Curated annotation (Swiss-Prot):
CDD domains found in the cross-reference section: PL1_Passenger_AT
Region described as Disordered: 110-146, 623-686
PANTHER family attached to this UniProt entry: AUTOTRANSPORTER (PTHR35037:SF7), C-TERMINAL REGION OF AIDA-LIKE PROTEIN (PTHR35037)
Cellular component GO terms, alphabetical: cell outer membrane
Glycosylated residue positions: 74, 86, 93-94, 97, 100, 112-113, 116, 119, 124, 131-132, 135, 151, 154, 162, 170, 176, 181, 188-189, 200, 226-227, 230, 238, 248, 263-264, 275, 294, 305, 313, 322
Chain intervals for the UniProt region annotation (12 X 19 AA approximate repeats): 82-308
Annotated localization: Cell outer membrane
Record keyword DNA damage present: no
Name of the protein: Autotransporter adhesin/invasin TibA
Length: 989
């Protein structure tokens, strides 16, 4: 480089000094230089030849508008406090140095080839280029300023402030840079940085070909390593973060609050995660040889991978079964591959998610660890939960052993199912939702388990000193039994229910409005055949209900056996069948206690056992079911289906209305002798099922006779309305009949129906004959005195003939067939619904004769006599509670005599005949047989005399059309009909 020097006299030193032609400040002024030109030339001639001397520049300003736009420093040249403005350039090379240079917008400082720059300040728009052996030390890069280090250049101690940038590229290097908030350091294409400190808000970008070593990331400082970039020995402190986007990192140390994020294509090797630090691996990210110390955390997302992981005690792994993870922990080797996790250790924030179709085997869930099993995920081997370890998931399938270790205080809400087992050793757990473990539940070492609003199906094995609590509506189905140490205690409260699935043993059982159910529930697998179940207790206290089963027919049933004291109040809700006991009246024990003041009562007060009802009896400290033996009372007269005892004077008296009361042979097997004598011996009370059968056996007779009664009014006025050549008629009828019966078999029969027919009338010499056919239908609702509502659907038809003459005589005959479709509905004493459907055929008829007399011009009288007969065929029926009944042929034979008094009026030109009627009827049938369970015979006696009273009116609207209406009241030994009504019409051809 060509340089021009001046030789000037320095008065202060008394010597000649060689200076650059650019020197002004601090030297002689230009006019003084001109005065010494001659002296200089002389000196040049006189002095010997010598090399050029180094130049020193202080406080120079270069750039556009200045005397000089550039400054070149080399070979020992120095410059201090230089200001480089827009367009100005300073070149520092070959031993030149610049100190405290200020580079403003548009200014450039080039440091290369052995040049050096110290303490430069790069402001907005200013640039410093360090290359080819140049070096820059302690540079400050401010907002908008840029330092570029490349091609062998180096920078040390650069401070990059907010908005400033440092680029280290193409063989450049930077050491000990400090990147502050908002500042950036870019490293790429062979650039190397070391010991960079990235502070709050600062950013370091390591790109393709760049490398960063010993970087320290402080609060919110970030290091971004993209594809082809590498970072080594990075230290990540609290709030700092390293992001690997295809780049690689080795030897990273992550401290409390620090984070490393490894994304797609990124890799990290030999990372150490200290307490509070976290390494996060995303899809297609890969880490290897990560060491997790106590309190540190490795999180691997689905599609990410981590290998050769060292999980120290207290270290946490957060991952799922769609990741690939392997390494060692306190329990040995662990791995996740192909949707299968093996030997995972989850503690101190560790979390494993098992996805649908995936599985986890031999998982250890420690304090603050979580195992999350999604629907379709499966647990195998031994899954262990300790301390505050948690199992979560909407649907968890356990095919292994789910083991809650001592001191576990875990809670579970969701569905836990599978063929595995659940073991709790010590601790206090709580389960809600749904639980089903085919392998059973094992409660050990003083453990306490609470089932809170849980639907559970599992057999439970307890040890002495353990406690199982059912609370808040829990339903448990399964056996509970002890082991060789004894049986644990149990509490059933808060409307909870325990369904026993077989014989069970409990230490101390406490009921707090809970229910223990011996019956098979919808979730059990018990066979339809009855199997008695026993519950053995050490002691019993509280209040609640025991729902039990008995089969008195085979003299067997469930047993509650309390070895110690029993105290409190308990209800026995006992179900039995309609089957007949082999040995009638033998007591059946249902409760045994070792002592105490416990009180047991029978729900409903009774239990059905085939034909008879049984009650609860106490003997010493034990309780038995025994056949009732109360005295008989008067039968009911006002049954009510909605309240079986309403209007029933024998309510609370179990044998009221028993026709065999006082008859020792009545109802005995095979006697068939209901009237074998009298006795003062107490009798048993029939069940509601028997009473319903007895009542339904008589219903066809009452239905048929009611229809036949209404049929006799088909003509209205037989002589006036029945005219040749004939006609058609129709009639609606409705009635409400209260029917008493033996053995409390009374009922209310409500009938609604119609009849319609047609006939032809033949005129004889002094009389007429009507011959016709008809069809009838009625719906008959039966409300049993002791509860239940049955129905008889009756349809039929027949033939009739009526003869009458001009003197007022008439004879009327009817033949009728009926089909009865019977639906029996009642319930047992325990509330179990009972039903049985069957059909019967019935045949019958009536014959009536009478005469109409004129009392005066308008009044008339019509006496008559009438007889009816009916027979329904016998029927074998079976109820759904197992009861059988043989209904014999039901017969009815009645005779009736009556009188109608009326008058004939002319109303608006129409003939109207109001009338009153009275009659007395007697039923002769008193021996209709019914046999129950092939054992007990009953006699339905429907005989008795009945008074009938009515009023009606016939109106002849036209010569060929008439209408009529009638209302009647009936009262007799067996029946009372407060009102029976009918309306009809006839049209003659």
């Amino acid at each position: 480089m060509n340089k021009v020097y001046n030789t000037v006299w320095n008065e202060s030193t008394g010597t000649w000094v060689v200076t650059s032609e650019l020197t002004r400040k601090g030297g002689l002024r230009p006019r003084q230089i001109k005065r010494t030109v001659l002296a200089g030339l002389i000196a040049g001639l006189l002095m010997p030849s010598m090399p050029a001397l180094a130049a020193a520049y202080d406080n120079q300003t270069i750039g556009r508008g200045e005397t000089s736009k550039s400054m070149h420093l080399s070979a020992g040249d120095t410059a201090k406090n230089t200001t480089i403005n827009s367009g100005g350039k300073q070149y520092v090379s070959s031993g030149g140095s610049a100190t405290s240079t200020t580079i403003n917008i548009g200014g450039v400082q080039h440091v290369s080839s052995g040049g050096s720059a110290t303490s430069s300040t790069i402001n907005s728009g200013g640039h410093q280029h360090v290359s080819s052996g140049g070096s820059a030390t302690n540079t400050t890069v401010n907002n908008g300023g840029r330092q570029t280090v490349f091609s062998g250049g180096s920078a040390m101690g650069t401070i990059i402030n907010s908005g400033g940038d440092q680029y280290v590229i193409s063989g450049g290097s930077a050491t000990s840079a400090s990147v502050t908030s908002g500042a950036r350091q870019f490293v790429s294409s062979g650039g190397i940085v070391k010991a960079t400190s990235v502070n709050s808000g600062g950013r370091q970008y390591v790109r393709d070909g760049g490398s960063a070593t010993d970087t320290v990331l402080n609060n919110t400082g970030r290091q971004f390593v993209s594809s082809g970039g590498s970072a080594a020995k990075t230290t990540i402190n609290s709030g700092g973060g390293m992001y690997l986007y295809g780049g690689s990192a080795t030897g990273t140390s992550i401290y409390n609050g620090g984070r490393q994020y490894v994304s797609s294509g990124g890799s990290a090797t030999n990372t150490t995660v200290y307490s509070g630090g976290r390494q996060h691996v995303y899809i297609d990210g890969n880490v290897t040889e990560t060491t997790i110390t106590s309190g540190g955390m490795l999180q691997v997302e689905a599609g990410g991978s981590a290998s050769k992981v060292i999980q120290n005690s207290g270290g946490a792994v957060i991952t799922n079964t769609s990741a690939a993870v392997s390494g060692t922990n306190d329990n040995g080797s662990f791995s996740i591959a192909g949707g299968s996790a093996v030997n995972m250790l989850l503690e101190n924030g560790g979390y494993l998610t098992v996805f649908d179709g995936h599985q986890a085997s031999d998982t250890m869930v420690g304090s603050d660890g979580t195992l999350d099993v999604r629907s379709g995920g499966v647990l195998y081997g031994t899954t262990t939960l300790t301390d505050k370890g948690a199992l979560v998931g909407d649907v968890v399938t356990n095919e292994g052993n789910l083991y809650y270790l001592n001191n576990s205080t875990a809670t579970f809400t969701g569905t836990l199912t599978g063929t595995g087992t659940l073991t709790q050793e010590g601790g206090n757990t709580r389960f809600s939702g749904l639980l089903s473990q085919d392998g059973g539940i094992f409660l050990q070492s003083g453990g306490a388990m609470t089932m809170d609003a849980l639907q559970a199906k599992a057999n439970v094995t307890t040890q002495s000193g353990t406690t199982l609590t059912l609370d808040n509506g829990t339903i448990l189905t399964g056996n509970v039994a002890g082991d060789s140490t004894g049986a644990g205690d149990m509490a059933v409260k808060g409307a909870s229910v325990w369904h026993l699935d077989g014989d069970s043993t409990v230490g101390a059982l406490t009921l707090d409005n809970g229910t223990v159910d011996f019956r098979p529930s919808t979730t059990t697998r018990m066979t339809p055949a009855f199997q008695a179940v026993s519950l053995a207790l050490g002691s019993l206290s509280g209040s609640g209900t025991f729902q039990m089963n008995t089969d008195i027919a085979s003299h067997t049933g469930d047993m509650l056996n309390v070895a110690g004291n029993a105290s409190g109040n308990f209800v026995l809700d006992i179900k039995n069948t309609g089957l007949e006991p082999v040995s009638a009246g033998a007591p059946l024990q249902v409760v045994q206690t070792g002592g105490g003041d416990a009180a047991f009562t029978l729900k409903g007060g009774k239990v059905d056992a085939g034909t008879w009802e049984y009650g609860l009896s106490k003997e010493n400290t034990n309780w038995y079911l025994k056949a009732d033996t109360p005295p008989p009372v008067t039968p009911p007269t006002n049954p009510d289906a909605d309240n079986p005892d309403a209007g029933n004077p024998d309510a609370g008296n179990p044998d009221a209305g028993n026709p065999d009361a006082g008859n020792p042979d009545a109802g005995k097997p095979g006697t068939g002798k209901p009237d074998a004598g009298t006795s003062s011996s107490p009798v048993r009370r029939t069940t509601k099922s028997v009473d319903a059968v007895l009542g339904m056996a008589t219903a066809p007779a009452y239905v048929f006779n009611s229809e036949l009664d209404n049929l006799r009014f088909r003509h209205g006025d037989v002589m006036q309305n029945t005219r040749a050549p004939g006609g058609v008629w129709g009639r609606y009828t409705g009635s409400d009949n209260r029917i008493s019966g033996g053995a409390s078999s009374g009922y209310t029969l409500t009938q609604n129906g119609f009849e319609t027919g047609a006939d032809m009338v033949f005129d004889l010499s002094d009389s007429s004959l009507a011959v016709g056919t008809f069809f009838s239908y009625s719906d008959n609702s039966i409300k049993h005195a002791r509860g239940g509502k049955s129905n008889v659907d009756s349809s039929g038809g027949g033939l009739y003939a009526t003869w009458f003459d001009n003197d007022g005589y008439y004879v009327d005959g009817v033949l009728k067939y009926n089909r009865f479709n019977n639906e029996l509905r009642t319930w047992m004493s325990d509330g179990t619904a009972v039903k049985g459907d069957y059909s019967q055929n019935g045949f019958g008829g009536s014959l009536e004769a009478g005469r109409t007399f004129s009392l005066n011009e308008n009044a008339w009288a019509q006496p008559y006599v009438r007889t009816t007969a009916f027979r329904a065929d016998k029927k074998e029926i079976r109820l759904n509670n197992g009861m059988k009944a043989s209904i014999g042929a039901t017969k009815s034979l009645q005779a009736e005599a009556g009188l109608k008094l009326g008058m004939t009026l002319d109303v608006a030109g129409k003939e109207v005949k109001p009338y009153l009627s009275a009659a007395v009827s007697h039923e002769f049938s008193d021996n209709n047989k019914v046999r129950i369970n092939d054992t007990y015979d009953f006699r339905n006696d429907i005989s008795g005399t009945t008074g009938k009273y009515g009023l009606g009116v016939n109106a002849q609207l036209t010569p060929n059309a008439g209408v009529w209406a009638e209302a009647r009241y009936e009262n007799g030994k067996q029946t009372e009909s407060p009102i029976t009504g009918g309306v009809g019409f006839r049209i003659n051809f």
